[in-house]
Every structure is written in C-alpha cells, then in structure tokens.
C-alpha cells in the first residue's frame, strides 16, 4: 500500500542543501521508499540529496510526498513533521 500527502514548503529558502540533508538523514531511520513530487511533476527520492536539490522548490510551493514500504506510515508522518517545522530553519 502507498500513502500520500501534499504539504507546502514553509521555510524561507525552500529546498536547499541543509533541508535536503536533514530529509536524507531522517530517511535513514525508516524502512520505506519516500518520493517527493513538486507541482511541475519533478520526482525525487528522499534518500538522494542531489535529487532533492533538483526539485528546485521555493517557499510556498506544494510538494506531494509518497511513501511505500513496511514503515510507510511512520516515514510519511516524519517527513510531514519536518516540512511543517520548516526544517527547523525559521
């Protein structure tokens, strides 16, 4: 089963190196594949910092998060919490 949710980027600088690293590090704790899709359809695996940077998503943009795997629900909740916290940057 796959779980999905859309979130809005709330941190001032959007998806840049620091948030990408935080997300990458967070994903190491979960047995799940997590994909992020921006509003232009670009997809990035959450376990790839380079792919996350390619999302080129600024503050206010929508990101769809999709998780699949044994810990998909937990992984999705953790990613949503990180986005909602503005990656602890603000």
Swiss-Prot record:
Check the record and name the InterPro entries matching this protein: HPr, HPr-like, HPr-like_sf, PTS_HPr_His_P_site, PTS_HPr_Ser_P_site
HPr domain mapped to chain residues = 2-90
Q: Name one GO cellular component term.
A: cytoplasm
Metal-binding as a keyword? no
> In its UniProt record, which GO terms are filed under biological process?
phosphoenolpyruvate-dependent sugar phosphotransferase system
Going by the UniProt record, its keywords in alphabetical order are: Cytoplasm, Phosphotransferase system
- What job does this protein perform? Component of the phosphoenolpyruvate-dependent nitrogen-metabolic phosphotransferase system (nitrogen-metabolic PTS), that seems to be involved in regulating nitrogen metabolism. The phosphoryl group from phosphoenolpyruvate (PEP) is transferred to the phosphoryl carrier protein NPr by enzyme I-Ntr. Phospho-NPr then transfers it to EIIA-Ntr. Could function in the transcriptional regulation of sigma-54 dependent operons in conjunction with the NPr (PtsO) and EIIA-Ntr (PtsN) proteins.
Q: What is this protein called?
A: Phosphocarrier protein NPr
